[in-house]
């Protein structure tokens, strides 16, 4: 922990991150945000592929890595070599958690499976994120986030009914699995305080998606209903949609409760809508959803998004324009709550990124540094933690183990 910052709740937790891409490393980011010392293991010479992922470059660097690897320490180990595997085994007694997202069985092939590592550290918590989990007939299949999204149910219900299933604009499957993995890690850590024993946290990417599918399963089981794509509406819940504006943007209005709809009707200058039999109750509005949406859209087209926001705020109607990064960086509420912060990067200068979520009143998380250079912390970890000598490091480097 840096002596120049306040303490964080996970300052006494050390994590060895063996994963790559997103599903494992985002879990590591969440833990590091709250103070965990996350030691990220990367292949020598090339590092995590996420170092090269991203839509745009600035000063020759992609911009995903500085966010995903923030607060982490980078060391290099070739896990495919006996010497590299031996280094991991030497590190395991010094850590609380091992985080990995290889295909099931890979670490076992390298002699780094649960049985081997647990024997070295009985209190170890091993966080295992994979496409389909560590058990079951699909455990050995390759499974990226897109496959988990498809099989977990979210692709089938995303988009419009007359078009093919649509991808959400972010890697939601990987991120959900990572978030649940972080939750599982903290639950296991709490249990270890009681028992002194570690355990495996096992999540398949598809399960992280499935967990958010609301009542989709019992709806089919008990009624035979299969949810379909519905575009931007909530079926039978109205009004809740996006509406066009006079300045060519889109505006979200959610006024599906009776009292809120009454206020919306007043804001529209059409208070009679609240007593119209077609719209007077939640059920009636649901039955006349398209008709109601058309009425609201015809009204919103007369105003800019800013004008609509003023009116909706005045009448207490939940509403807002659809933001891009441009609006987020200038919004006074984002600024007041420091939802986006600036972090110094030695190569990029100040880089803006999302702040730590959630907020803790007494021991909040924070961001101390952006994603590190490849192997930046080799000497710190290998010499200070493991006691290797300069000769040891030179030999391992010569063999390309680190």
Curated annotation (Swiss-Prot):
EC number: 2.8.3.20
Keyword Transferase listed: yes
UniProt xrefs under Gene3D superfamilies: Crotonobetainyl-coa:carnitine coa-transferase, domain 1, formyl-coa transferase, domain 3
Single GO term (MF): succinyl-CoA:(R)-citramalate CoA-transferase activity
Record: active site: 174 (nucleophile)
PANTHER family in UniProt: L-CARNITINE COA-TRANSFERASE, SUCCINYL-COA--D-CITRAMALATE COA-TRANSFERASE
Subunit structure and binding partners: Homodimer.
Family membership noted in the UniProt record: Belongs to the CoA-transferase III family.
Name of the protein: Succinyl-CoA--D-citramalate CoA-transferase
Gene source species: Chloroflexus aurantiacus (strain ATCC 29366 / DSM 635 / J-10-fl)
């Amino acid at each position: 922990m840096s002596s120049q910052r306040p303490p964080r709740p996970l300052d006494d937790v050390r994590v060895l991150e063996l994963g790559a891409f997103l599903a494992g490393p985002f879990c590591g980011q969440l833990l590091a945000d709250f103070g965990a010392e996350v030691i990220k293991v990367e292949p020598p010479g090339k590092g995590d592929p996420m170092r090269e992922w991203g839509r745009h470059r600035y000063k020759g660097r992609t911009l995903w890595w500085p966010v995903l690897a923030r607060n982490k320490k980078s060391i290099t180990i070739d896990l495919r070599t006996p010497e590299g595997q031996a280094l991991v085994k030497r590190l395991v007694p010094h850590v609380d958690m091992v985080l990995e997202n290889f295909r099931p069985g890979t670490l076992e092939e390298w002699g780094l499976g649960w049985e081997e590592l647990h024997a070295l550290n009985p209190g170890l918590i091993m966080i295992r994120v994979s496409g389909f989990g560590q058990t079951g007939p699909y455990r050995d299949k390759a499974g990226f986030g897109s496959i988990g999204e498809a099989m977990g149910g979210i692709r089938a219900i995303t988009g419009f009914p007359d078009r093919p299933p649509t991808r959400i604009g972010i890697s939601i499957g990987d991120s959900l699995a990572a978030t649940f993995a972080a939750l599982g890690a903290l639950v296991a850590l709490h249990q270890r305080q009681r028992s002194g024993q570690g355990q495996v946290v096992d999540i398949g990417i598809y399960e992280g998606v499935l967990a958010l599918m609301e009542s989709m399963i019992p709806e089919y089981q008990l009624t035979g209903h299969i949810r379909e794509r519905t575009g931007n509406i909530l079926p039978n819940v109205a009004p809740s949609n996006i509406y066009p504006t006079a300045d060519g943007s889109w505006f979200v209005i959610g006024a599906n409760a009776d009292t809120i709809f009454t206020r919306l009707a007043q804001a529209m200058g059409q208070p009679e809508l609240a007593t119209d039999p077609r719209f007077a109750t939640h059920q009636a509005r649901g039955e006349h959803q398209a008709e109601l949406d058309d009425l609201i859209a015809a009204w919103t087209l007369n105003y800019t998004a800013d004008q609509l926001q003023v009116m909706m705020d005045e009448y207490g109607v939940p509403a807002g324009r659809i933001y891009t990064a441009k609006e987020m960086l200038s919004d006074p509420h984002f600024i007041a709550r420091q939802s986006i912060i600036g972090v110094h990067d030695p190569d990029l200068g100040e880089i803006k990124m999302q702040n730590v979520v959630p907020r803790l009143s007494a021991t909040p998380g924070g961001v101390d540094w952006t994603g590190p250079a490849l192997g930046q912390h080799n000497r710190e970890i290998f010499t200070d933690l493991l006691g290797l000598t300069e000769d040891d490091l030179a030999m391992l480097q010569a063999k390309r183990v680190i």
